[in-house]
């Protein structure tokens, strides 16, 4: 059998076929490129050189090249994942629970309106962690949660401040994709609680904003409700139009408090 570059290309593609890898063939230069779908990092193989080796070593030449490419791509993938950070992201409870049928995302309950998902972020690529990716990473769900919360605490924060009718509003909007994630930083919430004199209200209307408010009167509640609705409507990744009263580590949706107030008011009038 006479070996050609085209036959060698077909042989290598057959041996290196994996769902996470792509092939590109330049017939003019007789080069086969094998690359990772996610990162686009890869290896170029000059086919005439492999054919020349095949003329001498036959099957062994193909095995050596396939092994070299496979090991190099796996090493690249490990290097990329070791440089990547796992971070939590806040999503609405209506957000999909599966990447595709039979492949659920790794999730944690947060509030009645929000759920925590986990992202593998290597600066260039961003992917929510599902069960299949979890297996590739060689981590447990608990390890992912612990790593994510640790990394969330390292996110910087600097608030802009505005006061309306005696109520003070603090805005975080760095646009790093993790503004809403800061709601999981317990030490940040506690430090804000210490400087707030009224009710501490927290809102994550969309992915790129965290609002913390010092509410001292009913006008403040009206303002935060309108503000949250406006941000929710404008966000690229909307989360919830509701805001929450934060107390002792718990988040109570405002509409529940409003209902309770109405019941109390009704009893007093009766």
UniProtKB/Swiss-Prot annotation:
Pfam families in alphabetical order: DUF1444
NCBIfam families hit by this protein: PRK13668.1
Family, as annotated: Belongs to the UPF0354 family.
Name of the protein: UPF0354 protein BCAH187_A4826
């Amino acid at each position: 059998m006479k070996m050609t570059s085209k036959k060698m290309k077909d042989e290598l593609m057959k041996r290196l076929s994996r769902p996470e890898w792509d092939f590109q063939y330049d017939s003019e230069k007789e080069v086969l490129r094998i690359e990772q779908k996610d990162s686009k990092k890869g290896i170029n193989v000059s086919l005439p050189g492999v054919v020349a080796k095949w003329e001498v070593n036959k099957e062994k030449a193909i095995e050596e090249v396939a092994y070299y490419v496979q090991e190099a791509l796996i090493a690249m993938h490990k290097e990329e994942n070791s440089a990547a950070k796992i971070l939590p992201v806040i999503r609405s409870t209506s957000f999909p629970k599966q990447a595709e049928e039979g492949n659920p995302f790794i999730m944690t309950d947060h509030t009645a309106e929000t759920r925590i998902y986990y992202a593998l972020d290597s600066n260039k690529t961003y992917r929510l962690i599902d069960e299949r990716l979890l297996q590739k990473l060689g981590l447990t769900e608990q390890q992912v949660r612990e790593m994510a919360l640790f990394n969330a605490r390292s996110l910087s924060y600097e608030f802009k401040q505005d006061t309306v009718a005696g109520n003070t509003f603090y805005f975080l909007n760095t646009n790093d994709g993790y503004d809403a994630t800061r709601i999981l930083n317990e030490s940040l919430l506690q430090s804000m609680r210490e400087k707030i004199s009224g009710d501490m209200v927290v809102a994550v209307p969309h992915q790129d904003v965290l609002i913390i408010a010092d509410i001292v009167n009913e006008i403040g509640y009206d303002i935060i409700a309108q503000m949250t609705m406006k941000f929710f409507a404008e966000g690229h990744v909307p989360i919830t139009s509701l805001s929450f009263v934060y107390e002792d580590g718990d988040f109570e949706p405002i509409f529940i408090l409003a209902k309770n107030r109405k019941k109390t008011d009704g009893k007093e009038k009766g």
